[in-house]
Amino acid sequence: MIRSFIRSSALLLALLPVTGYSAGPLILVGGGLKDDNTAIYQRLIQLAGGNGQARIGVITAASIPESDDPDAGTADAANSKANGEFYAQLLETYGAADAQWIPIDLDQISNNSNPQVVAQINSMTGFFFGGGDQSRLTQTLQTATRADSPALAAIRARHNAGAVLAGTSAGTAIMVQGPMVTGGESYDGLRYGVYTTPSGDDLSYDMQGGFGFFNYGLLDTHFSERGRQGRIVRLADHTQVPFAFGVDENTALLVQNNATLGQVEMEVIGENGVFIFDLRNKERGTGSTYALYDVLGSYLTAGDRYRPVTGQFVIASGKTSLRGRERYSAAMTVTTDIFSSPNNSGANGRRKPREFVKVSADLFDSRVTSTLGRTYETNPLSRRSVQKHAVRQPWLPGHRWRQEHAVLPAFADGFPS
């Protein structure tokens, strides 16, 4: 076990930069960003130069254009221009000296090479990418061969010079360097596999990736709320990417250089948490059904930090170790919707959002070492075993656990041996 850990740590060091993170910070929001999330918005303003100094360019090309919005020009408008103007006003409310919509969308693709728009971009100290559909971002900010347009090249140059980039939902997903998830549900990914063309609930991804600002693993959003643990692990396994990051709603993963340490450091900001999955020591099952074992998962919440070069986790002060203080003798009743299925929905959406987190948190506050979670779909039934890691210290609310995945026939009552 120790030798295996040393070997895998050496692999990690070979994959990641060993020097400081030279570009500007990244603020990766998992979607569902509330207007009153002071922690995230104020951090964006601070990193862009501070109150009265920050100049933020707002990019909402992931939204539908004005020409496709039946409510354009009304208070119900939800198009690129309306969303851009809304975010610009909100950012100025939080202290930006200036915030401007960058007028590039499906109605105005040619603006990605307009010298005036490029000059506008060059005057900014930070950028905010709104949500929607990341395919619209590739259509509007990249060329037909997926090269940078002049506008994206200018954004990249500003970022390399220190400008902060923030994104939410699709605006976060597009930041990834490697394979980019484009759709799908956890159950479907585990049951049917991975595709390169989006269709319904199929797990799909773009092999060419996103804009390449985040190079530490896969990225996913709306994570715990939509039970996306299964889909990101399946995609990471399929694409042979050793790490995957899932950001919850109204929550951000801040990625920036720690000058004192001389290396990149990630910090969780906001309401919920961020999952980090480590697949370096994964093992595939040998049976006829898909099975994956020894995936390590960590769940960090506000103030917790992760240093990817060394693999070190730093738990925020004020959080207390649960070891020896567990309140329960048994974990919660086995859930029948571990991945918060959209097929189990009511008037307010998914009936059991964040179910994976609830099950895991309950496990760590108990004196047992493992629990099971079942999927809502039963043909076939999929079970998940969540286990406490035998070595690492559990924390609340920064839980860490070992996770096993397998898709089993409905009549099975255990994992493949």
UniProtKB/Swiss-Prot annotation:
Signal peptide start and end residues: 1-23
Residues annotated as the enzyme's active site: S169 (charge relay system), D188 (charge relay system), H222 (charge relay system)
GO CC annotations, alphabetized: extracellular region
Alphabetically ordered keywords of this record: Hydrolase, Protease, Secreted, Serine protease, Signal
Family classification: Belongs to the peptidase S51 family.
Intracellular or extracellular location(s): Secreted
Record's catalysed reaction(s): [L-4-(L-arginin-2-N-yl)aspartate](n) + H2O = [L-4-(L-arginin-2-N-yl)aspartate](n-1) + L-4-(L-arginin-2-N-yl)aspartate
GO biological process, one term: proteolysis
PANTHER family, alphabetized: CYANOPHYCINASE
Enzyme class: hydrolase
Domain of life: Bacteria
Enzyme Commission numbers on file: 3.4.15.6
Protein name per UniProt: Cyanophycinase
GO molecular function: peptidyl-dipeptidase activity; serine-type peptidase activity
Record carries keyword Cytoplasm: no
Keyword Phosphoprotein in annotation: no
Gene3D superfamilies assigned: 3.40.50.880
Known role: Exopeptidase that catalyzes the hydrolytic cleavage of multi-L-arginyl-poly-L-aspartic acid (cyanophycin; a water-insoluble reserve polymer) into aspartate-arginine dipeptides.
Pfam families associated with the record: Peptidase_S51
Regulation: Inhibited by serine protease inhibitors. Inhibited by N-Bromo-succinimide.
